[in-house]
């Protein structure tokens, strides 16, 4: 496996910050190498510098998205932030009492547990009143899992 120089790692730090607003500390160097090493192999590249050049060439948007997917960490589970859902219940109940439609956008929704948690709260609080939940994420890989809506029991803590 190729090793990554400090200069190469610094380029990837800038890349993921520019692409996703994610700051990778120096402690994440091993993680980055582990996640991207198979991409070097897949393209027959010998260095992380070569892989970075591929990403910057502007000729492979799919590979850029793959790199972003690999460098994002997606940890989530149902009802992960209880206080947020308590607040949502209050706001939704107020909107329901005024017969207003309700729309929630879950940015950085990862694999969708938050979206489905929001939907459960809105279904409970708003019943037949109109409501909608929209989820988005920079990682197309996790959005695919969110669309499937199948989760292991461990995601419900």
Name each model feature, range by range.
Residues 1-105:
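Conserved AdoMet
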Residues 86, 116, 144:
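Alpha-helical elements of the RecA-like P-loop NTPase motor core of helicases
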Residues 88, 109, 146:
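Conserved RecA-like P-loop NTPase ATPase core
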Residues 90, 120-124, 148:
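Short, well-ordered alpha-helices that flank and scaffold nucleotide-derived cofactor binding pockets
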Residues 108-110, 137:
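Conserved S-adenosyl-L-methionine
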Residues 111-128:
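Conserved SAM-binding loop of SAM-dependent methyltransferases across substrates and taxa
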Residues 129-157:
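Extended basic-aromatic, gly/pro-enriched interface segments that bind polyanionic ligands
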């Amino acid at each position: 496996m190729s090793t990554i120089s400090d200069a190469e790692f610094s380029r990837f730090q800038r890349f993921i910050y520019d692409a996703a607003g994610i700051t990778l500390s120096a402690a994440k160097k091993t993680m980055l190498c582990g996640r991207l090493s198979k991409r070097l192999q897949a393209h027959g590249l010998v260095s992380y510098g070569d892989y970075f050049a591929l990403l910057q060439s502007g000729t492979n948007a799919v590979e850029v998205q793959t790199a972003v997917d690999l460098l994002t960490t997606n940890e989530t589970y149902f009802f992960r932030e209880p206080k947020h859902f308590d607040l949502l219940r209050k706001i939704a109940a107020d909107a329901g009492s005024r017969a207003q439609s309700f729309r929630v956008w879950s940015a950085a929704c990862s694999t969708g547990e938050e979206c489905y948690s929001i939907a459960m709260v809105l279904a409970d609080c708003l019943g037949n009143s109109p409501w909608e939940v929209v989820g988005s994420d920079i990682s197309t890989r996790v959005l695919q899992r969110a669309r499937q809506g199948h989760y292991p029991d461990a995601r419900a803590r």
